[in-house]
Amino acid sequence: MYTLLPSQVKPHLAYLKKSFGGSPSLADIKSGLLVALMALPLSLGIAKASGFPPALGIISAIVGGLFTGIAGGSAITIKGPAAGLITIVSAALLAFDQSLGTVAAVLTTTAVLQFLLGRLKLGALGSVFPNSVVHGMLASIGLIIIAKQIPVLLGVDPKLYAGKNPIPMFLDIPWYFQEANPTIATIGLISLVLLFLLSNVRGKLFKTIPPALIVIAATIGLSVFLHLNTQGPSFALVKIGDWTSLLELKPDFSKAGTFLFWKFVLLFLFVSSLESLLTVKAFDFMKTGAAKANSNKDLEAQGIGNFILGLVGGLPIISEVVRTTANVGFGGKTAWANFFHGLFLLIFLVFLIPLIECIPNAALAALLIFAGFRLTSPKQYFQTYQVGKEQLALFIATIVVTLATDLLMGVLAGMILKLILHSFKGVKPAQFFQTQVKEDPNNGHCLLVLGPCIFSTILLYQREFNRAKAKGIQSLDFRQCPFVDHSFMSFLQQYQVESELELKGLTDLKPFSDHPLAARRLIKKNL
């Protein structure tokens, strides 16, 4: 019999402590438990909405918790399946004739590319996409989620809306109410109202117990009281069954030579990586007490998790914003919180299946509609308008094209429109990927920025600024810069914090709105 000696175990424990940010604390264990309780229904709902067996949603979150922390990256982000990927995953499943194996092959390929992006330190590529286009993409995902979950919320027979696109589904909402199952619709609408009410209630109780958990507990009670398992329709409740058989699924690469396969690889890679990088960036700006994240390491961790999930047919995982927000609120400080969130989910899946199968699908739909609303709330539209009318135009254009076609076309349309608008502002096509800087002849510690600063030049200028800083430059002067767009202003806000370089001259340029990060241009004065 082979046994591990203490001397053999010690190096492994030391490696885990280093990877996870020290020994596990009681705060991390507590946060892991509370996040797991919140992640359980979300993971079930995301899997079901994506067209996957619900158990695979939990399995994906388990992998996101147990295996990604080893690679490092972000100390406080929680990895798991996300509502923002429902649209792509369900579209892939539909495109490949419901073949989970082909989608698994797409995910496995995506994971390898994700890991390579992190290893090659290309995590900063997420900066090249215009802010308003990214927000438009997320808002369109929110609208698609809402459209596809309304009939589930109302208890409409899935056969009546299977395969429909979001715009027809929005137009069919009055008909869905006519076809609603009164009992299921009541549960769904009560769940939705409770989520909106409880999310706006302030108090100690709601910092400890997530509103989603209260809703699920209440609807489990309702489903038992109303005997939905025996008297409700077959689609009323979550079905788990023998989840261990799902792990036998293998990736099917037979479509790897097709354009469709690589289109979805690109979509999976783009949206999942971008959402993760946005989450990591957002929480780096918050004073959480956690160590600063390494976005490249986080991509590597995501790639490792997604590779494992591709091999077993799971859903893609990202650094998920809702769970991460909860983790910060619950006091999680290290990657152990993510690990314990995965461990507790594993315990739930093994021991609590009878209870999980009492959860109404309408309650899960309510959770997803609430998540979708947060992505596309009126506040998002108003905040975009405040930055500038041209930003709202980009935002709306991305949404419209996405709803009419798909996410890839929506983002491409938004970026093309952005470049067209920049052309009207005087930016020449030759300057779309060009930098123009020189040292100030009157001040050897200052770098003059002389060319347009737009989203497509962010990485190029970042390289120039880093080189200049290494040579002793202490400030960047934008007084002669002809144009700075909103995405570049957002980049400068973050870059100034990281580099501690002084920014000069931005207030001398004329902004397009009163927003501090509004696009601005040089107004030449007549002498």
Question: Where are the regions that the model predicts?
Answer:
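Hydrophobic residues within alpha-helical transmembrane segments
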Residues: 63, 81-82, 108-112, 190, ...
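Alpha-helical transmembrane segments and their helix-entry boundary regions
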Residues: 57-58, 76, 84, 103, ...
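Core transmembrane helix bundle of multi-pass membrane transport proteins
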Residues: 1-32, 89-90, 94-290, 345, ...
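Membrane-helix interface "capping/anchor" motifs
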Residues: 70-80, 200-207, 329-335, 378-386
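Hydrophobic/small/kink-forming positions within alpha-helical transmembrane segments
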Residues: 36, 66, 84, 115-116, ...
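Hydrophobic alpha-helical segments within and immediately flanking transmembrane helices
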Residues: 42, 59-71, 82-95, 341
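The feature marks cytosolic C-terminal regulatory regions of anion transporters and related permeases
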Residues: 374-527
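Membrane-embedded helical hairpins/re-entrant loop segments and their flanking transmembrane helices
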Residues: 16-21, 25-34, 38-75, 254-336
